[in-house]
């Protein structure tokens, strides 16, 4: 319980009987990774509950009178629908409950994946993420394996020692692909080592349209104030929507579900048409 009398927090201890609408999570990282927390519900139930929550917040809690609310237009794709993901490197891999129970010392504690909720310096090693086209998984895992094999130092998110920091993958409906590797570089030999990694990525994945890199020697991960360098290809990719072409750069914002963005804009056009 929190200190506020109106707030109650609970955690599951035991299931006596599952709901008939309960779904089996399809991701091997479900329950540990902080994303996709509603995988135990079919997508149709997810959007139904989300609409109910918004309506309750406005009407029951906010006392706002609302007109009839149209149902949520769900995404046609519920897997591999994002066009952008950012992965984090860390020399402190999150150990699963099963690994902790084994009570052994693990030789490999580097990881690339997603931050663990409430543990900013630890990263869950991701083998397969269902959010983005599978090329994203293949690139991430290839970079990870190359870094393991050649002893690249992963960043320590507390002391800021190390080299490898982040990797961003952007895909598009045009088939173009952008990869951005972000590292901390303070010595010439580190830069040479970093460029070897970039060359490996370029050689292994010739389908990459835009291979970029950023040197970030700050304590935070923001890149908006940093220079972006082109290692191979263009400094941008293109996205298309209904005959319109959008130039997407490494710092650009574009709705992360490209197909659903078009659905949204069609609704806007419908409501604004005379």
What label would you give each PLM region?
Residues 232-273:
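SAM-dependent Rossmann-like transferase core, predominantly class I methyltransferases
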Residues 6-229, 266:
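SAM-dependent transferase fold signal centered on methyltransferase-like domains
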Residues 1-5, 9, 271-274:
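Single conserved hydrophobic/aromatic residue that forms the stacking wall/gate
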């Amino acid at each position: 319980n929190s200190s506020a009398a109106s707030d109650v927090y609970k955690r599951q201890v035991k299931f006596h009987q599952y709901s008939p609408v309960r779904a089996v999570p399809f991701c091997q990282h479900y329950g540990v990774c902080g994303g996709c927390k509603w995988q135990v519900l079919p997508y149709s139930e997810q959007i139904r509950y989300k609409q109910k929550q918004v309506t309750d917040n406005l009407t029951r809690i906010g006392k706002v009178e609302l007109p009839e609310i149209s149902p949520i237009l769900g995404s046609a794709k519920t897997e591999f629908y994002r066009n952008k993901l950012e992965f984090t490197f860390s020399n402190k891999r999150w150990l699963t409950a099963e690994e902790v129970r084994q009570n052994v010392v693990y030789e490999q504690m580097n990881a690339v994946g997603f931050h663990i909720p409430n543990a900013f310096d630890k990263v869950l090693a991701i083998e397969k993420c269902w959010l983005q086209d599978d090329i994203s998984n293949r690139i991430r895992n290839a970079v990870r394996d190359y870094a393991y094999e050649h002893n690249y130092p992963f960043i320590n998110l507390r002391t800021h020692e190390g080299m490898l920091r982040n990797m961003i993958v952007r895909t598009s409906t045009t088939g173009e692909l952008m990869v951005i590797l972000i590292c901390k570089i303070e010595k010439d030999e580190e830069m040479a080592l970093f460029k070897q990694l970039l060359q490996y990525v370029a050689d292994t994945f010739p389908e990459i349209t835009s291979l970029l890199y950023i040197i970030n020697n700050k304590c935070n991960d923001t890149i908006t104030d940093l220079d972006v360098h082109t290692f191979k290809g263009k400094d941008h990719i293109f996205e298309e929507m209904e005959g319109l072409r959008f130039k997407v750069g490494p710092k650009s914002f574009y709705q992360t579900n490209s197909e659903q963005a078009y659905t949204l804009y069609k609704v806007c056009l419908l409501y604004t048409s005379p």
